């Protein structure tokens, strides 16, 4: 009863306000223009490096992505990716000792549980767009287990250089809010944590290192 009475009193109060509102105004049109850059790609590279990421270049038709990943992380032995371009045989072929080291490739789409990805050295994913103002990359959940984005020691993000926008306003206008994506995240360089003593620690909560491969 008390809840009902409170609700009625609230409605009565709001109705009185509506009755006594003599002048109404349309909602203002708010146009926010974010920062613009002469060269968005150059700014993205500079910002990515400033937040601790490494940036590498590759051509679109380059079949060397496995070699590029191995060049970036030659000591890695356990990889995770659901990208068809990432292949165990090619990762094995580009091991520093000529292919005698055992290399493991886990697929986040086929593991039974997310904790099976624990111990992953390098995760390779594809980003949807990059943002020049802060060096972040939007990564939608195109994999079953999104834990691969956070549980791996290092993260490699493949990004089309033509998909870099100026600012976050442009980014939110372009990201695909598709129901098939249950999750998405902006990642800007490696994980960073700072305490009250202003000590910056990288990799405490996610990847210790991030490499963005522009193609």
What is the meaning of each model-derived region?
Residues 2-215:
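The feature marks the mature, well-folded catalytic cores of soluble enzymes
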């Amino acid at each position: 009863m008390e809840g009902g009475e409170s609700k009625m009193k609230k409605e009565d109060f709001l109705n009185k306000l509506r009755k006594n509102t003599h002048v109404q105004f349309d909602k203002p049109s708010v146009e926010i223009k974010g920062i613009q850059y002469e060269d968005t790609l150059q700014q993205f590279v500079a910002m990515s490096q400033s937040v601790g990421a490494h940036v590498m270049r590759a051509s679109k038709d380059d079949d060397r992505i496995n070699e590029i990943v191995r060049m970036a992380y030659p000591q890695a032995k356990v990889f995770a990716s659901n990208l068809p371009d990432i292949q165990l045989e090619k990762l094995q072929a580009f091991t520093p000792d000529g292919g005698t080291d055992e290399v493991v490739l886990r697929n986040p789409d086929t593991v039974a549980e997310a904790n099976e990805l624990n111990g992953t050295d390098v995760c390779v994913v594809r980003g949807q767009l990059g943002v020049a103002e802060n060096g972040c990359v939007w990564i939608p959940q195109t994999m079953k287990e999104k834990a691969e984005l956070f549980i791996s020691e290092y993260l490699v993000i493949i990004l089309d250089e033509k998909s870099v926008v100026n600012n976050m306003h442009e980014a939110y206008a372009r990201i695909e809010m598709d129901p098939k994506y249950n999750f998405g995240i902006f990642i800007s360089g490696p994980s960073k944590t700072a305490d009250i003593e202003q000590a910056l620690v990288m990799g405490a909560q996610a990847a210790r290192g991030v490499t963005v491969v522009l193609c």
